[in-house]
Structure formats: C-alpha cells, structure tokens
Curated annotation (Swiss-Prot):
Homology family: Belongs to the complex I subunit 4 family.
InterPro entries: NADH_Q_OxRdtase_chain4 (IPR022997), NADH_Q_OxRdtase_chainM/4 (IPR010227), NADH_UbQ_OxRdtase (IPR003918), ND/Mrp_TM (IPR001750)
Organism: Cryptomeria japonica
Protein name: NAD(P)H-quinone oxidoreductase chain 4, chloroplastic
Any Gene Ontology biological process: electron transport coupled proton transport
Transmembrane segments: 4-24, 31-51, 87-107, 113-130, 134-154, 167-187, 211-231, 242-262, 274-294, 305-325, 330-350, 386-406, 416-436, 462-482
Keyword set includes Disulfide bond: no
Pfam family, one: Proton_antipo_M
Length: 499
C-alpha cells in the first residue's frame, strides 16, 4: 500500500471523476450533486488516511515523492511531494471544497458544468500545493484559472462578466511573470535545464538576477494574495460571484499566493527575500489600515467582507517579511485561519441574500428576530474575524506581532512603528465588523427589505457553519493542533542562509 502513487491519486481523482458527469441522465441533477459531494468527501478522507499512516510529522524533508518523466524534450516531470507546509493547505483545500460543494446545493442552472468546474478547480489547487517541479507548479496555477473564470461569468450577479474578465486579465498577467521566472531559473547554469525544486534551491544566482526573479514572482503572488495595490480585482469578484465560489476564492485561492511567496521566493531566493522583507512588512502594515478603512465605507455586504479579507492578508505579508520562526508560523496559521473564517462569512452573506434579496447594508436592519440562527452564527464568525481570544485568528495575529517585535535585524523604532500601525488595524476591524452586524440585524427596517418573509437556517446550512466553526475554536484553544504540522518545515527554512 505504501508504494501506491498516493499524491497522484488525490490530485487526479476529482477532475477524472468530473469527466464522468456528462454520462449522468439529463434529469439527474440530484444525483450529480450527491456524486460530486461524494467525490470531494472521498478525496478528503483519502488524504487524511495518507497523512495519518504514511507521513512522518517530525521529518522536515519532502515525503511521499513521486517523479515521472512527462515531456523528456524539455525535462518536464510530473513530480509531486509534500512537507508540513503543504499538508495544512491541502487539508484546508479538501475541507473547504467539500463544504462549498454542499453550499452549491440550491444551484439549479446547468449543475453539470458547475460541479465539473468545482472538481477541476479542486484538482488544480491540490496539484499546486503538491508540486515539486516549477513548471508543474505553473501548470497547476493556470489550471484553476479557467474554472474560476467560468464560475464567475456563468453563476454571478449583474456585472459578472466584467468581474470575471477583470479576474482573468489580472491573473493571466501575473502568470506571465511565473512562466518567465520559472524558465529563467530552470535554464540558468551550465548543467542543462532543470525545473526540480530541490535542484533549483542549490543554484547560486547572481544577486541582480535573484532580485529580478524575486520581483517577477512577487508581482504574480501580489495579484493572487492579494497585495496592495494589485488587489482591485478581489472586491469586484467577490461582489458578483455566487457564494459557493466565494468560499473557494476566500478559503483556498488567496492562499495560493501566500504559498508561492514562501515556497519559491523565500525558499529558492533567500538572499533577495532578506532584502525585500522590510518592504513586505511596510506594505503589509499599510494594507491592513487601507483595507480596514475602505471596508468601513462599503455599502455592499460582500465588498465589505472582501476588503476585510485584504486587511487580514496584510498580517500574512508581515509574518512572511518578519524573517522569524514565530512570525512565519503565525503567517501560515493566519492563512489557514482566514481560509475557514472567510469561507464561513461569505457563505453567511450568501444565505442572508437568499432570504432578504439585498446586499446593501442601508436596506437591511432588524432581521435578528426572524433569523436568530443566522444572527448567532454571523456574530460568532465576526468575532473570529476580529481575532477574539479563544479563536484561531487571535493566535495567528499574536504570533505575527511577536515575530516582528523579536526580530533584532530591524531597528527598535521600525518595530514599534509597524506594531503600532498593525494594532490600529486591529482596532478598526471590530469597528467595521460590529457596524456591519448592527446595521444588518438591529433596528426596525425588516419590513423594508425586498422579501420580508423568510425562514431561518436549515440543517444543511447549520451543518456547513458548525463544520467551519469547530476547527476555528479548536485551533484557538489548542494551536498545536495545526502548528505541529509545519513546525519542522519552518525550522528547516530558517536553517538556510538568508544573508
């Protein structure tokens, strides 16, 4: 059993199963939903089994490696492997995608294509987190682009084509930099082309080339993460997408940018990373404040949550730039934490819209009494988003603060200023979140909404929300539940020379 190509199986299974969907009878919409949900759940259980019985968590090396020669002419290999950093994001992908599939249950328009696209996106994201070849990394980066574009353009709001096109142009533009960087790294040197991560890490690049490569990759990841000022596609995309797609975007897609920033920029280009790290911290601090202030001015509920996501990603950037063991641990934990919280908030926004048929805060008010379950869950996840102690966001943000403060590479003045700016962002977060809750659920406007007659959450919706809430509480109370996955990997990253 240990010799099976486990990683190839979990990467290929979703998209292969999706190709069978056209064979289902035309009136088998319910069957397609159950089939897709079953495939997602099977893949999640399979990866849980693999990591439980075939992975050694105290080992920082790449494990479960698979290497198959794919295109010999250009030395392109199907090479997969995982370490502690990959595992957390792969499990997050499986968990959020399974719940997003369940969230898409009410969609009745063209369900065959919808569920195939979700499965194709699932494979692309798993493949990216498991890639050990930089060309394969690029291929998987591109694979999820088309499913997301179609999900946005076919199941969205009135401006869905505009937002989908904007997403496509931004992401495709960033992908060019990944391809150029991958080819430059692979072809550099006198030993022939190689795109293997391990071999690329051993190459010694001239500092000028390393800086140029770092900048190119940074632009691509800045679009996906996103990093200010390349973030403008995100509010438009979230504002128009169906909430099941929003769950995948907030829960998984944004984390691809953070993953690339650590996996390629930090691991393969360490000297350039040490030069850029102060600038990452400054940009992250500015982003926290900017996005929080912008969120406060949003009338549209989805756009307010979208800017909240941008603000929270600022902490990830600071943690990556902190150049400390604690800060990087906090950044990875923040990625996982936000994946759960962001997915839950967008699901709640979508279920609220299904009932009251409006996304504008000034048209809401007084809906806490008719839908107390949604009110309770919305309040709970908002508390998680503002990093209430006892929840996952608090631990992650505290570790990031600690990482910045304890890095003596930076002057004490710089550390104090950055900490103060980020702390202001933490003060602004409850302001825009609590204001959102007040305008939605309190007051006397309930009869003014387009649909004043609606029901509270059903069993399916409560199940999704509870599944997302339990790990948030679990990580908040016992962070080692997640930290043990990648502690050894983070130690290995800092064992290399950055200077």
């Amino acid at each position: 059993m240990s010799n099976l190509p486990w990683l190839t199986i979990i990467v290929i299974l979703p998209i292969s199963a999706g190709l069978l969907i056209p064979l289902f009878p035309h009136k088998g919409n319910k069957m397609i939903r159950w089939y897709t949900l079953g495939i997602c759940l099977l893949d999640l259980l399979l990866m849980t089994y693999i990591f439980r019985y075939h992975y050694h968590f105290d080992n920082s090396l790449i494990q479960l490696e698979e290497d198959y020669n794919w295109i010999n002419l250009i030395h392109f290999h199907w090479k997969l492997g995982i370490d502690g950093f990959s595992i957390g994001l792969i499990l997050l992908t499986g968990f959020v995608t399974t719940l997003a599939t369940l969230a898409a249950w009410p969609v009745t328009r063209n369900p065959r294509l919808l569920h195939f696209l979700m499965l194709a996106m699932y494979s692309g994201q798993l493949g990216l987190f498991a890639s050990r070849d930089i060309l394969l990394f690029f291929l998987m980066w591109e694979l999820e682009l088309i499913p997301v574009y179609l999900l946005l353009s076919m199941w969205g709001g009135k401006r869905r084509l505009y937002s989908a096109t904007k997403f496509l142009l931004y992401t495709a533009g960033g992908s060019i930099f990944i391809l150029m960087g991958a080819l430059s790294m692979g072809l550099y040197g006198s030993h022939g082309p190689t795109f293997d991560f391990e071999l690329l890490a051993k190459k010694d690049y001239p500092i000028t080339l390393e800086i140029l490569l770092y900048l190119g990759f940074l632009i691509a990841y800045a679009i996906k993460l996103p990093i200010f000022p390349l973030h403008t596609w995100l509010p438009d995309t979230h504002g128009e997408a169906h909430y099941s797609t929003c769950m995948l975007l907030a829960g998984v897609l944004l984390k691809m940018g953070g993953y690339g920033l650590i996996r390629i920029n930090m691991e393969l280009l360490p000297h350039a990373h040490s030069l850029f790290s102060p600038w990452l911290i400054i940009i992250g601090a500015v982003q926290i404040i900017y996005a929080a202030l912008t969120s406060m001015g949003q009338r549209n509920l989805k756009r307010r949550i979208a800017y909240s996501s941008i603000s929270h990603m600022g902490f990830v950037i600071i943690g990556i730039g902190s150049m400390t063991y604690t800060g990087l641990n906090g950044a990875i934990l923040q990625m996982i934490s936000h994946g759960l919280i962001g997915a839950a908030l967008f699901f709640l926004v979508g279920t609220s819209y299904d009932r009251i048929r409006t996304l504008f805060l000034d048209e809401m008010g007084g809906i806490a009494i008719p839908i107390p379950k949604i009110f309770t869950m919305f309040s709970s996840f908002s508390m998680a988003s503002l990093a209430l102690p006892g929840m996952s966001g608090f631990v992650a943000e505290f570790m990031i603060f600690l990482g910045v403060i304890t890095n003596h590479k930076y002057s004490s003045t710089f550390r104090i200023i950055i900490t103060a700016i980020a702390a202001i962002g933490m003060i602004l977060t409850p302001i825009y979140l609590l204001s959102m809750l007040r305008r939605m659920f309190y007051g006397y406007k309930v009869l003014n909404v387009p649909n004043p007659y609606f029901k509270d959450s059903g069993p399916r919706e409560l199940f999704i929300l509870i599944c997302l809430f339990l790990p948030i509480i679990g990580i908040g109370l016992y962070p080692d539940l997640v930290l043990f996955l990648y502690n050894a990997k983070v130690e290995a990253i800092f064992s290399q020379s950055f200077y």
